[in-house]
Amino acid sequence: MPKKGKKPKLPLTDEEQLILFQQKLLADEEAAKKKERLLTQFLKDKLAKEEHNSSLNLNKINTQWRTVLREVKTRELHKDIEILSQIFERVVDCKDSVIKSLARDLTEAEEQYAHALRGHLHNVDQLLTLQRRRLSLLEENYNMELEVLTKEFETERKAILDHHDKEIHYLHDVFMAMEQNYVDSEYESKLEFQSMWDDLKNKNLEEKHFLRLQLENVVEDLWRRFQDALKNYTDATEDRKIAFETLKVKDEKSSKEIEVQMKKIQRLQEAISALKGKIVAHSREGEWQNQCIRNDKELVHVQLRKLKIQRTQARTESQENLVKLTLESNATLKALKKVVEKGEKILKLAEICRKFETEEEKVLPFYSSALTPEEQEEVEIQSQEEITEDLAKIMMDYLGMENFWKRYNKVKLEVLSLQHRRLQLLDISSKLREMLKQYLDGISVSDEVLSRLNPLFIVNHKSNLPQLPPSAAQPGGDRGPGGDRRLTYNVIEAAHIASHIL
């Protein structure tokens, strides 16, 4: 078949070209976006892969680094543990030494406490003994004074009872005499009253009979008048009668009360008379007692004056003693202050010197006795001698300082020993310096060396030592061929001597 020919392209219009251009731009833009998305996705994948690889590598590095760090840290920890173990051992040693020193201090403190306790108990026993003696003396004095007071009381009581019995008998006799006088006077009064009563009775009867006869008529007339007056009076004074009856009743009551009061007055008069008698008796007794009291008062005044004089003397003595005591107490306080300051200084020095103590001194701070058996026997013989009480008290006061003086004497001996050793070393040092100087002078040449005598210095076979005469220089040397003695010198080098000495 014949090929179909291509249709000829028709020319595009502007709009179609514009549309085609826009489609092309869109296709290019879409391709660019797709390419960008692919590139972005590739970069993201690559970044994720790199991050994954970096994390793996980091984990590997961290694992290996941890191993290295563990090893380094292990070595450091081993070193630290060794250092800490050494420090711990050193601290333990220090603590052990501190514990030992504290144990020794505790033992010393316990010994000092036991010693102080023994001293305190001994002092308490002495005080108790002294108090018992004082109480026994006071009890004896009290019993003696009680016995004296009892005797005085019994004597005074007996005298008072005797005086009381005498007064009772006297009052009884007086009472009996007064009663007898009263009975006699009463009997006489009754007889006189009876005679007077009879006389008056007879006289009254006679007068009554005469008056009856004389007054019968008058009475009748008066009776009539009285009846009239009575009637008039009764009528006029009925109210007054009632008031009179009331007053009469009151008068009876008052009379009864007066009678009762009279009886009371009589009883009171009797009591007053009895009390007057008692007052007289008591006044006599009181006068006697007042006289005794006056005498006692005079004695008390005399004793009071004596006591005032004694009190004045005692006050003067006490003031003088107080002044002396004040002066002595001030001096004692100053001395004690100095002692306390000295003790504090000793304690401070002891604390400073404690770190310089050796192990032996820390273990055995108090040395044992260094006396020989013979010296120990002499000390025992001297201690067996009689000791006075004052010396015993002084020894008891200074017994607590025994350990202190032991250490003090030990240190004093060590100081003396070190001073002696120092003098020896100074002597040796001076000798060595002298020998060294001689040696240096022998090997060196100077004006000072040339001016001194030196057996080692020889110039042109000549020494600067003076030549001795033959008789003095050759006392026992060998004789020469001509009969003269030859001079012999022993020369020893100073360095050789110094090496042997050092």
Curated annotation (Swiss-Prot):
UniProt keyword Zinc present: no
UniProt superkingdom: Eukaryota
GO cellular component assignments: axonemal dynein complex; axoneme; ciliary basal body; motile cilium
Single biological process term from Gene Ontology: cilium assembly
Coiled-coil intervals, chain numbering: 96-160, 252-285
Compartments (UniProt record): Cytoplasm, Cytoskeleton, Flagellum basal body; Cell projection, Cilium, Flagellum; Cytoplasm, Cytoskeleton, Flagellum axoneme
Pfam families recorded: NYD-SP28
Keyword Cytoplasm belongs to the record: yes
Keywords of the record: Cell projection, Cilium, Coiled coil, Cytoplasm, Cytoskeleton, Flagellum
Subunit comment: Component of the nexin-dynein regulatory complex (N-DRC). Interacts with DRC1.
Purpose of the protein: Component of the nexin-dynein regulatory complex (N-DRC), a key regulator of ciliary/flagellar motility which maintains the alignment and integrity of the distal axoneme and regulates microtubule sliding in motile axonemes. Plays a critical role in the assembly of N-DRC and also stabilizes the assembly of multiple inner dynein arms and radial spokes. Coassembles with DRC1 to form a central scaffold needed for assembly of the N-DRC and its attachment to the outer doublet microtubules.
Membership in a protein family: Belongs to the DRC2 family.
Protein name: Dynein regulatory complex subunit 2
Organism per entry: Rattus norvegicus (Rat)
